[in-house]
Structures are given as structure tokens and as C-alpha cells.
Curated annotation (Swiss-Prot):
Keywords: Cell membrane, Disulfide bond, G-protein coupled receptor, Glycoprotein, Membrane, Olfaction, Receptor, Sensory transduction, Transducer, Transmembrane, Transmembrane helix
Name used for this protein in its record: Olfactory receptor 4A15
Compartment(s) of residence: Cell membrane
Superkingdom of origin: Eukaryota
A Gene Ontology cellular-component term: plasma membrane
Recorded family membership: Belongs to the G-protein coupled receptor 1 family.
A Pfam family it matches: 7tm_4
Membrane association type: Multi-pass membrane protein
Species of origin: Homo sapiens
Disulfide-bonded cysteines: C125-C217
The UniProt record lists the keyword Coiled coil: no
Length: 344
């Protein structure tokens, strides 16, 4: 009997081994399905060839204006001793974030407008998602810091020089980047662990949360709620907190001189305009249930293209100190260039 059992085992073992090899475990099957999608197809803003050419020129100009405007602010603030206050330190930081934020998406989107095949690899899509929420998260916190700085400068000017020293400003900026990183990491991990087994078509010009949730081949209800809590709720609470702080600032202007009121009003108006431009699309896109709408593309354009382009214009339009510093700096540069050309 023992001999028969051993013989049967000898015969069946190779067969069982082959079956095990051919039949993947549930875990192996999950990983296979998860890795089915290696790239995503981006539909972009329009499928019309003529419309794509118009958009190519438009967004190329917007991107160039964004880069030049924000770099102009950064260079002017760094080179001008008169712009050494915390407000200008944070403004230069905001311009830097806007520059890298726009650069993370604009070049690919502009190139895709003239490309027949608009695809992005899975890894590239995840990198795009991470950068989107890293820069957006850092900007949200930085706008809060800028509101606090305006509160200190207008409501408690004697304490500002002590409280908002350079070390504190650097720590606040570092906190903004760390906060943006942690927020982005959470959103990234929520998406990265989802299985994507097809389809792979994203109706947008970049990879974002809800279009990706829509493509996941699993129930994403809980994941969607978690993302709302981590993204949309934070945006909404922060937005109304900033508006409330500016309400307090405007109320305190009753005791200011006429010139002080005018200067404070223009400073606050510029910042509130930037806050509204940034937070309204942010709240619309992320503080809602897991769903997508046709207007999402327009809101994403405002968030990633229009706001970074308008920020330099908004902050310099009514800012006499910035305009004066720019004139002095660039007249000096032109004068030096003229002397160099004359002697050469």
C-alpha cells in the first residue's frame, strides 16, 4: 500500500506542480491586473485640429508670460534692498512656486497639442499627480502665511519686526513645503495602491485624482471620501479662514490714517484676488463627491495656467514699491549694458 502511494505521488507531483504554475494565486492575479495599464491616453482640451493649433499658440504665450513675470519678481526682490520685508520674501517664494507649478504641466500639454499620440506612462502620470498636489499644497499653506504676515503688519506693526524675523520667515516657508509634501504623499498613496486594469483614457490634459479614480477597477467610494477630507475640506476651511482674517484686518483699518488705509487696502485687495483665483477652482475640483464634470478642464486650466500668470500682474499693478524697484533695477541694467557696448 505504501509502495502504491509513493508511486501515485511520483506520478501526480509533476502534474500538480504544473497546475500550480499555470494557475496564479489571487494575489498574483491581482498584481497582474494591477499592472495591465502601463500608460494613459490624454484627450486634452479639444479634439479639433484647428482648435489645437490655436490653443498651442495661446498656452505657449501664457507659459512664456508666466515664466518671465514670476522670474522678474524673484530677481527684483532678491536684487533690491528696499524689498527686504517679510511680505516680499513670501511674494518671491510664491512666484517660485508658480514658476515650478506651471512648468510641471505646461511643456507636455503644449507639446501634446501638436502631437497625434497624447499618452503618458503610468510612472509619469503618478509623478504628475504628486507634483500637482505638492506645489498646490505648498501654495495653500503659503497663502495662509502671507495672510498672517499682513495681519501682523497692519494690526500689530510694532510686533512684526520682532515676530516676523528672517529665521521665522524661513521656518514658515519650510513648513509650507513640508505640509505640501505630506498632503501630496497621502493623495499619491491613495491612488498608487489602486488597481488599473483598463480602460486607460483620461478626459483631461493631465493626470488628476477624480479621472484616475474613475478608471480604477475597484470600489473607490472610501478612497474618494478620504481624498475629499485631505484635499477639498482643507481648501474650503483654509479659504474661509483667510477671508475671515482679512475681514479682521479691514475692520482694524478704522484707526489708520488715510494713506495707511489706502496702502493696506491695495495690499489686501491684491492678496484676496490671488486667494479667490486659486481657492475657487481648488474647492470646486476637490471638495465634492467622486465625480467628473465637463467644466473640470476649465477649472484645471485656471488653477495651473491662469493663476500663475496673473499673480505677478496682480501683485505689481498697484504696488508702488515693486514698480519703483523694477524701474531702478532695470534702468541700472540697461545703463550698464549701454556702457559695456560703448567701451567694446
Amino acid at each position: 500500500m505504501e509502495l502504491l502511494t509513493n508511486n501515485l505521488k511520483f506520478i501526480t507531483d509533476p502534474f500538480v506542480c504544473r497546475l500550480r504554475h499555470l494557475s496564479p494565486t489571487p494575489s498574483e492575479e491581482h498584481m497582474k491586473n494591477k499592472n495591465n495599464v502601463t500608460e494613459f491616453i490624454l484627450l486634452g482640451l479639444t479634439q479639433n485640429p484647428e482648435g489645437q493649433k490655436v490653443l498651442f499658440v495661446t498656452f505657449l504665450l501664457i507659459y512664456m508670460v508666466t515664466i518671465m513675470g514670476n522670474l522678474l519678481i524673484i530677481v527684483t526682490i532678491m536684487a533690491s534692498q528696499s524689498l527686504g520685508s517679510p511680505m516680499y520674501f513670501f511674494l518671491a517664494s510664491l512666484s517660485f512656486i508658480d514658476t515650478v507649478y506651471s512648468t510641471a504641466f505646461a511643456p507636455k500639454m503644449i507639446v501634446d497639442l501638436l502631437s497625434e499620440k497624447k499618452t503618458i506612462s503610468f510612472q509619469g502620470c503618478m509623478a504628475q499627480l504628486f507634483m500637482d498636489h505638492l506645489f498646490a499644497g505648498a501654495e495653500v499653506i503659503l497663502l495662509v502665511v502671507m495672510a498672517y504676515d499682513r495681519y501682523m503688519a497692519i494690526c500689530k506693526p510694532l510686533h512684526e519686526l520682532i515676530t516676523m524675523n528672517r529665521r521665522v520667515c524661513v521656518l514658515m516657508l519650510l513648513a509650507a513645503w513640508i505640509g505640501g509634501f505630506l498632503h501630496s504623499l497621502v493623495q499619491f498613496l491613495f491612488i498608487y495602491q489602486l488597481p488599473f486594469c483598463g480602460p486607460n483614457v483620461i478626459d483631461n490634459f493631465l493626470c488628476d485624482l477624480y479621472p484616475l479614480l474613475k478608471l480604477a477597477c475597484t470600489n473607490t467610494y472610501v478612497t474618494g471620501l478620504s481624498m475629499i477630507a485631505n484635499g477639498g475640506a482643507i481648501c474650503a476651511v483654509t479659504f474661509f479662514t483667510i477671508l475671515l482674517s482679512y475681514g479682521v484686518i479691514l475692520h482694524s483699518l478704522k484707526t489708520q490714517s488715510l494713506e495707511g488705509k489706502r496702502k493696506a487696502f491695495y495690499t489686501c485687495a491684491s492678496h484676496v484676488t490671488v486667494v479667490i483665483l486659486f481657492f475657487v477652482p481648488c474647492i470646486f475640483l476637490y471638495a465634492r463627491p467622486n465625480s467628473t464634470f465637463p467644466i473640470d478642464k476649465s477649472m484645471t486650466v485656471v488653477l495651473t495656467f491662469i493663476t500663475p500668470m496673473l499673480n505677478p500682474l496682480i501683485y505689481t499693478l498697484k504696488n508702488a514699491e515693486m514698480k519703483s524697484a523694477m524701474r531702478k533695477l532695470w534702468s541700472k541694467k540697461v545703463s550698464l549694458a549701454g556702457k559695456w557696448l560703448y567701451h567694446s
